[in-house]
């Protein structure tokens, strides 16, 4: 979704990706801890050069999420970072995945409270699914990802546009844990992507 918009520079980090500019393919590891320990040096140096102000989209559903903290540690001092942390559905969280989710969930909040990062946006996949309504099974994940992307993009559009009329006040510096959502004007109903 973000590649459709020229204002975003998309950097992908995952296993099994074809290496190219802004794409980093990591070797498959058996645990989140091994991903954290085995981050290639070139990822950190490259990201320090490339990334100035970014939002990192992270989910804990795979072991590769263990790389998130190591990558963040390498770039956080030189970069204004916000994190969009996507929490898997509760049915998918058990064993090590649940522990990894709890670790990232708490560490990202602590980083935002201490101003090590600009902000953390918490997104619950179940809440996004509820907001999306019925979706064909084969397009389920694509629909959820598109909804998150489109919502985040429109917030960026509004934040970088001059309002004709506003009732909003400036965000206070200590408000660093957030979520996003949708408003249904017909029902006058907010559909938040996480319950804060």
What are these regions (language model features)?
Residues 1-196:
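Tubulin/FtsZ superfamily GTPase core signature
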């Amino acid at each position: 979704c973000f590649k459709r918009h020229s204002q975003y520079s998309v950097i992908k980090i995952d296993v099994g990706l074809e290496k190219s500019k802004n794409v980093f393919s990591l070797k498959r590891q058996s645990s989140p801890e091994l991903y954290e320990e085995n981050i290639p040096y070139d990822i950190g140096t490259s990201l320090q050069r490339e990334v100035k102000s970014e939002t990192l989209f992270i989910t804990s559903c795979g072991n590769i999420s263990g790389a998130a903290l190591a990558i963040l540690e390498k770039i956080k001092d030189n970069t204004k970072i916000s994190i969009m942390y996507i929490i898997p559905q509760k049915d998918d969280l058990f064993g090590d995945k649940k522990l990894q989710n709890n670790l990232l969930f708490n560490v990202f909040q602590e980083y935002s409270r201490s101003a090590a990062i600009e902000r953390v946006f918490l997104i619950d996949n179940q809440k996004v699914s509820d907001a999306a309504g019925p979706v064909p099974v084969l397009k389920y994940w694509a629909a959820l990802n598109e909804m998150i992307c489109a919502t985040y993009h429109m917030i960026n559009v509004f934040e970088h546009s001059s309002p004709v009329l506003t009732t909003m006040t400036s965000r206070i510096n200590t408000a660093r844990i957030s979520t996003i959502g949708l408003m249904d004007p017909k029902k006058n109903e907010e559909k938040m992507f996480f319950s804060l």
